Amino acid sequence: MLLPNLIASRQGRLIAFFFLYMTEGIPLGFTSTTMAVQMKRAGIGEKAIGIFVASLYLPWAWKWLMGPIVDLVYSNRLGARRGWILGTQIMMVLTLLICMPIELSSDNLQLITLLILIHNLFCATQDVAIDALACNVLSEKERGLANGLMFAGQTLGVPLGGACVLYLIEGIDLWWLPALRDGIPVQSAYWFVIACILLVTTLVVLPMKEIPHERRNTSRDRLQTAKTEIVSYITTTWKSFVGKSVARYGLLFALLPAGANGLSLALQKTVAVEIGFSDGDIADLEVASSILWAVMCVLGGIISDRLG
């Protein structure tokens, strides 16, 4: 049976972008929640865990470097955006497979941090390609709801890779799945995350068909154009931030919610372990907050489409 090309219809596009963004949240939840909690239980200090969690998000700050490259370097045979999404998802899976046998201990922390940093580099690049695809295939009337669903998917992906894995590690008492009653080791939890990513790869990405992009430049010209766009972006951004005091205050205001969220990333998990929360308790907290966040994302998207 042939799987549908989801981006060919409005409903399909909304479903596709929801699940594509979910593949960004799943590994983030696994690394920032599951791995951070297990590191704390293994006796790794808060400072080291904080550095590890901070490294997860570092590649996301440099997505603007990949934007021109994703725009200009592509294969019409694979699909201009589909090729990037497919390639980055495969590399995300490979980095998790490499990381799987490594024990979460202070001796291995530098190696694990490096591997997860590389993993998130591919995850952030995938985000650039997904956004580029959205710009190409979404109509103006679809963008508000689609954007809300995208961030809802990412938000729900976090507890799927974090809270759900913590439930599996602690153990789930299901009469029809007695093997999960005593819990699973952390190394086995990697397979759950990998399976979630590959499920989206198989059902959403592989059947996807893009309209071929017209090539206007040679490979060398495209790379030169990418370099020019990056330099132009840096120059324009710098002038925008330092040229007016309003822009500087705007930048500070934009950092406030991100800073508060960043403070909670590692601190919340390590403190929860210290005060006696079980893996299930931490998972419950993450599920509740993520569901509320996801609902607000969708509502915001609907309001955006209605009000403009």
Please annotate each region the language model reported.
Residues 2-60, 246-253, 257-278, 282:
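Helix-loop boundary and gating motifs at the non-cytosolic
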Residues 59-63, 144-170:
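Glycine-rich segments within core transmembrane alpha-helices of 12-TM secondary carriers
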Residues 61-79, 296-308:
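Helix-to-loop junctions at the C-terminal end of transmembrane segments
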Residues 68-74, 100-104, 160-184, 305:
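Transmembrane alpha-helix termini and helix-breaking/packing motifs in multi-pass membrane transporters
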Residues 194-217:
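C-terminal membrane-cytosol helix-exit motif in multi-pass small-molecule transporters
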